[in-house]
Amino acid sequence: IALMLPLSGNLASSGKAVREGFMAAYYQSLQRGYEVPRISIIDTNSAGSLELAYGDALALEAEWVVGPLDKKQVNELAKLQRLPLPTLALNYSDHEAMAKQPDDLFQYGLSAEDEARLIAERAYTQGHRRVLALAPDNSWGKRIYSVFEQHWLSLGGSVAGQQFYKQRKDYNPDIKALLNVDDSQKRYSVIRRLMRESMEFEPRRRQDADWVFLLALPKQGRQIRPMFDFNFAGDLPIYSTSHIFSGKSNRKKDVDLNGIQFTDLPWLLEKSALKQEIEKNHPRAKGGYARLYAMGVDAFRLYPRLKQLSALPHSKIFGVTGDLSMDTEGKIHREMPFAIFNRGRPVAINLDKE
């Protein structure tokens, strides 16, 4: 196996996290007496080009490539008619590049799109039908929201309201606009002018929605969540992607996320001996890079089973990043468990008991 990752340059920290996870799974298999391949590690950043990196892999007598991690390089691969070696890319190509994808290219990563679809399905099975959606006003936020909206509508749900927010210190105007609290206050002002006298008034939020889809990072989420309480919407269930959780428990800060349900990797919600060992040897594995370590673990366990997943359409592998399955284009999709913030801590939800 040639493990092709960026180990220098801008993506070096991410590449090293994936490498450490991959090698930890390798050594665990070795200790258990399983047959393991010889691993050669290639730095895609210093190789000069993807073509040269594959040249190195062939010179090292690799039979498989795991990597690259960089999305631009995965797009390059997807545009080729044939690959020099069968490849498990650790990212997803853009849809435009997918049209003539080579047969021996498989794609696996931590797709936010998968999470958005899962949330739509979870909310629908919980009986919710009309959503209020809040997402960042950038290309990533719009892309993930678009995937969510498409899937939500296909299930039979509807969108009561939607707001894209810019990064700022105060998100109250965005929440008020989404909840139509401003309209309630404007109506009061009109009535008061017409009647020419003061009257008792309590602003109201819109009543045509039964849940909220929130796409936010922890810092924004901690500011946004309390604003729903402040604007008379504390009773609306809020669902979010894994981006709402930093990956490291912080009760003091995350108490502001209480009640938010989110989907995340089993790696972060469950205990395992391998996870404890990785965290002991790599302090960064406890924070923002935790998910990339987990991705490395699953990349090692996934590559020998790709043919099985391809041949058996409904088969799954139970990985540390979720239950993994493959579509007809060779893309790996994940199903993940859900958790809820309770007293500032993420607590796994046992879906079987609901």
What residue spans do the PLM features occupy?
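Extracellular/periplasmic periplasmic-binding protein-like sensory domains
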Residues: 181-189, 207-209, 225-297
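Segments of small-molecule ligand-sensing domains
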Residues: 281-347
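Structural motif
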Residues: 36-59, 115-118, 168-178, 195-198, ...
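Extracytoplasmic ligand/sensor domains, especially the bilobed periplasmic-binding protein
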Residues: 64-163
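Short beta-strand segments enriched in small/hydrophobic residues
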Residues: 1-15, 131-133
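Beta-alpha junction/loop-to-helix N-cap segments that form part of ligand/metal-binding clefts
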Residues: 13-18, 32-96
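Periplasmic-binding protein-like
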Residues: 58-70, 87-90, 130-136, 160, ...
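Short beta-strand elements in bilobed, periplasmic/extracellular small-molecule ligand-binding domains
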Residues: 29-44, 102-106, 153-188
